């Protein structure tokens, strides 16, 4: 009996170990690191949501859904370093997603050993700091949790439990609500269900997703004082439009640059998937009953649809990394069929090839990563945990390392409890660092607002005169519209320069420099 229990749970135990030794190990070292702009935006959303809701106010209707930030906003009710807390939450969700995906590949491949080799390799790639930075950079791994769980449940569907498609639909909808661009995965799943099971089962999937999706949207609308439901979706495209001028200039360049970065990181997995695809088609031509071509096309679609996101907005390497789960599914299918139809000697050679290729593919990047000073810590878990309570962001030695921290320290000294702040040029991280909030969603990023006003200085002057943020830090980044912001601020007649964040090549985020302006009428 004990032997059967151990064998039954062996895969789960190994999945947990693989997740901890790859995802956990790579991420935990970076948790105490300095603030960065991507995570700063999500952290600001959490800050704002908590501030509004805890004060009994409604969320401004023009704020995006940002469900991940909303459900984690409770950290602002605790006397801790919220940056660190949110990174810990992101790590825990990434561990959960890693375990679930291991189980998906184990089921798809039918091999525990194959899963250990391939999933370990892909997790080392996907959790490299260059893609995830320091945690809570975006909602990708949070959305993976319901999506991978839906995949795992779908692999265990039989004629007696078709009711589970309601649950699968709900999980898929949750994944989309957490990260809106993943609606492409949702649509892919819907098409796959239709082809595999017919329209009656598809209806169950759609009903499940509708129940959870519309219920969640209903509460989100209530939190926004019953605003127009279309505003929630419009706000997502608002954010895309604020990058529109950059996308027009850099869309093609970014696509090729960052796709090549992703290919270089996972070239060995692409090779596995390519040969697996050829092998599956070879078997299909021999006898269609030998393989499930529908299943292959499902995994292929999962590998390709993330590319669509990079074609409609400015794409980066971490967007292309979302192709990896689909590629891994193709490789797992190929191994399962090879295990069924090939001789033992062939399987041994193929497995040896996979191991050698995985090591040669992962080793160069992982060795460079592990040679970074951040991985010299002897007690990374306790160090990251202690930063929850004793943050080094307020220590002068740490402040000197980052222009974000330098700017935040200056702004805090120049403000009081009731002050507000406006920034420009990827500086939203300053809101949670200073504890200040913008006067509105529009003034959260003045460059984005300026763009949406078609660079109309008069309109922006009127908005600043009407809303009067206490402090403005426009930064001097090389972005369209930034050079004209200082002129706009001066035209209001309301502000004076009170500090300068100097450019220094020896600090992190050195481009976050420039003048800090404050209302002339400010009273300390």
Predicted segments, located by residue:
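Hydrophobic, aromatic-rich transmembrane alpha-helices
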Residues: 3, 99, 264-295, 300-305
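Transmembrane-helix motifs of polytopic, lipid-linked glycan transferases
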Residues: 17, 88-109, 124, 148
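Extracytoplasmic catalytic/substrate-binding loops of multi-pass membrane glycan-assembly enzymes
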Residues: 30-45, 59-74, 80-81, 399-403
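Short acidic/glycine- and proline-prone juxtamembrane loop motifs at membrane-interface regions
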Residues: 131-141
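Membrane-interface alpha helices of multi-pass inner-membrane proteins
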Residues: 164-179, 186-191, 303-311
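Hydrophobic/aromatic-rich transmembrane helices and adjacent perimembrane loops
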Residues: 184, 312-353
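Membrane-lumen/periplasm interface segments of specific transmembrane helices
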Residues: 203-248, 264-271, 307-311
């Amino acid at each position: 009996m004990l032997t059967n229990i151990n064998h039954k749970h062996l895969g789960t135990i190994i999945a947990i170990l693989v997740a901890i030794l790859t995802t956990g190990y790579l991420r935990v070292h970076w948790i105490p690191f300095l603030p960065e702009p991507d995570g700063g935006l999500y952290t600001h959303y959490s800050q704002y949501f908590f501030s509004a809701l805890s004060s009994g106010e409604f969320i401004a209707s023009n704020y995006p859904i940002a469900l991940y930030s909303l459900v984690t906003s409770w950290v602002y009710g605790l006397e801790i370093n919220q940056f660190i807390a949110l990174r810990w939450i992101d790590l825990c969700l990434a561990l959960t997603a890693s375990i679930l995906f291991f189980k998906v590949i184990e089921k798809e491949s039918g091999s525990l050993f194959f899963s250990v080799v391939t999933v370990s390799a892909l997790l080392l790639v996907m959790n490299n700091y260059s893609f995830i930075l320091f945690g809570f950079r975006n909602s990708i791994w949070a959305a993976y949790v319901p999506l991978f769980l839906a995949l795992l449940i779908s692999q265990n569907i039989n004629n007696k439990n078709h009711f589970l498609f309601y649950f699968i639909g709900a999980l898929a909808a949750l994944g989309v609500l957490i990260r809106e661009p993943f609606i492409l995965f949702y649509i892919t799943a819907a098409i796959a269900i239709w082809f595999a099971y017919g329209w009656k089962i598809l209806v169950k999937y759609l009903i499940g997703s509708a129940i959870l999706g519309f219920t969640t949207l209903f509460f989100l609308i209530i939190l926004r004082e019953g605003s127009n439901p279309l505003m929630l979706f419009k706000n997502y495209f608002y954010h895309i439009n604020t990058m529109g001028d950059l996308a027009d200039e850099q869309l093609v360049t970014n696509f090729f640059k960052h796709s090549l970065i992703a290919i270089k990181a996972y070239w060995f997995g692409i090779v596995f998937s390519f040969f697996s695809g050829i092998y599956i088609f070879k078997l299909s031509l021999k006898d269609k009953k030998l393989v499930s071509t529908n299943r292959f096309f499902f995994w292929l679609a999962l590998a390709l649809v993330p590319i669509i996101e990079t074609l409609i907005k400015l794409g980066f390497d971490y967007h292309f990394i979302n192709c990896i789960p689909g590629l891994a599914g193709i490789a797992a299918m190929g191994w399962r069929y090879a295990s069924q139809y090939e001789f033992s000697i062939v399987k041994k050679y193929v497995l040896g090839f996979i191991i050698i290729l995985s090591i040669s593919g992962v080793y160069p990047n992982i060795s460079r990563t592990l040679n970074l000073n951040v991985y010299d810590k002897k007690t990374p878990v306790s160090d990251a945990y202690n930063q929850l309570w004793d943050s080094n962001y307020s220590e002068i030695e740490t402040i000197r390392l980052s222009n974000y921290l330098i700017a935040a320290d200056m702004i805090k000294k120049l403000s009081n409890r009731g002050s507000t702040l406006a920034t420009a040029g990827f500086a939203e991280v300053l809101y949670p660092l200073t504890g200040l909030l913008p006067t509105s969603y529009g003034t959260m990023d003045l460059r984005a607002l300026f763009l949406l006003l078609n660079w109309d200085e008069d309109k922006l002057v009127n908005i600043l005169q009407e809303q009067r943020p206490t402090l403005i830090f426009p930064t001097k980044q090389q972005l369209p519209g930034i050079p004209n912001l200082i002129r706009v601020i001066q035209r209001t007649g309301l502000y004076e320069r009170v500090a300068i964040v100097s450019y220094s090549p020896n600090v992190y985020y050195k481009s976050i420099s420039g003048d800090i302006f404050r209302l002339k009428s400010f009273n300390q």
